């Protein structure tokens, strides 16, 4: 299937044959598994010192003293020690570094999940259901000439995004970003940031600097493209802009 290629003014200038990866069936179940597997691989194993709470000289005084028969310090004050319910005692069931905390996924399933997430970016219904504004987007997938990769100024990318019809979605991401409700504000996640358009390029020649200050916009080189870029929060159908070189590289990788 052939689709149009647009210049930086939003005008069609050429046509390109889409790679077969855009015909992959929609598999939200695999996409969700792949994203969760990617999340869990960022978790760091944690454990406790095996001797924590046990560095005490204690004794059990036995029965007949009118007090609980727990381990107590040998020297006054004879506080309870060592046991889990005592101050400074050991943990009853501490976390172990041996715990399996990573979710696994088969290689072929992960590859199929990425292919399915790529195909979902070309489906208007899936993209709209994710919350993106695509009323002025001329086509999906939106493919742009490679000159976009060289734009390094924020004001220039703003004008380009307006002409391509994706600026409304960036404004949506800006309006939805703000201070989080609840106690998460005190726990290192004060702000919520909405996801806007994704820019996939064949090579970074300055576009990262030009687009990084726009709220919700991410730029990724196609060789580093992962399922988390295409389906943030396990929700596929992200509004995506592709360059011609990125499409050709997709053809080499996925066919």
UniProtKB/Swiss-Prot annotation:
Keyword Heme attached: no
Signal peptide start and end residues: none
SUPFAM superfamilies: Ribosomal protein L4
Pfam family, one: Ribosomal_L4
InterPro entries with a match to the protein in the record: Ribosomal_uL4, Ribosomal_uL4_dom_sf, Ribosomal_uL4_euk/arc_CS, Ribosomal_uL4_euk/arch, Ribosomall_uL4-arc
PROSITE patterns: RIBOSOMAL_L1E
Top-level taxon of the source organism: Archaea
A single GO cellular-component term on record: ribonucleoprotein complex
GO biological process, one term: translation
This protein's UniProt keywords: Ribonucleoprotein, Ribosomal protein, RNA-binding, rRNA-binding
Entry's Gene Ontology molecular function annotations: rRNA binding; structural constituent of ribosome
Protein's job: One of the primary rRNA binding proteins, this protein initially binds near the 5'-end of the 23S rRNA. It is important during the early stages of 50S assembly. It makes multiple contacts with different domains of the 23S rRNA in the assembled 50S subunit and ribosome.
Family per record: Belongs to the universal ribosomal protein uL4 family.
HAMAP family: Ribosomal_uL4_A
Summary of subunit composition and partner proteins: Part of the 50S ribosomal subunit.
Stated name of the protein: Large ribosomal subunit protein uL4
Organism per entry: Pyrococcus horikoshii (strain ATCC 700860 / DSM 12428 / JCM 9974 / NBRC 100139 / OT-3)
């Amino acid at each position: 299937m052939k689709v149009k290629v647009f210049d930086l003014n939003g005008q069609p200038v050429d046509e390109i044959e889409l790679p077969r990866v855009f015909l992959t069936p929609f598999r939200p179940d695999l996409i969700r598994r792949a994203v969760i597997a990617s999340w869990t691989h960022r978790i760091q194993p944690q454990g406790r010192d095996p001797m924590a709470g046990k560095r005490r000289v204690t004794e059990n005084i036995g029965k007949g003293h009118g007090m609980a028969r727990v381990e107590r310090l040998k020297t006054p004050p004879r506080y309870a020690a060592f046991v889990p319910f005592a101050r400074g005692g050991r943990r009853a069931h501490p976390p172990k570094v041996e715990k399996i905390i990573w979710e696994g996924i088969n290689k072929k399933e992960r590859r199929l999940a990425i292919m399915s997430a790529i195909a979902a970016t070309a489906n208007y219904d899936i993209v709209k259901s994710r919350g993106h504004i695509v009323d002025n987007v001329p086509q999906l997938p939106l493919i742009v000439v490679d000159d976009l990769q060289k734009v390094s100024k924020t004001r220039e990318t703003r004008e380009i995004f307006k002409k391509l019809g994706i600026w409304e979605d960036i404004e949506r991401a800006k309006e939805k970003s703000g201070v989080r409700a609840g106690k998460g504000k005190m726990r290192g996640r004060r702000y919520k940031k909405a996801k806007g358009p994704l820019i996939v390029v064949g090579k970074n020649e300055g576009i990262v600097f030009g687009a990084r200050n726009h709220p919700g916009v991410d730029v990724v080189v196609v060789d580093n493209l992962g399922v988390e870029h295409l389906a943030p929060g396990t929700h596929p159908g992200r509004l995506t802009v592709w360059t011609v070189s990125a499409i050709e590289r997709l053809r080499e990788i996925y066919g």
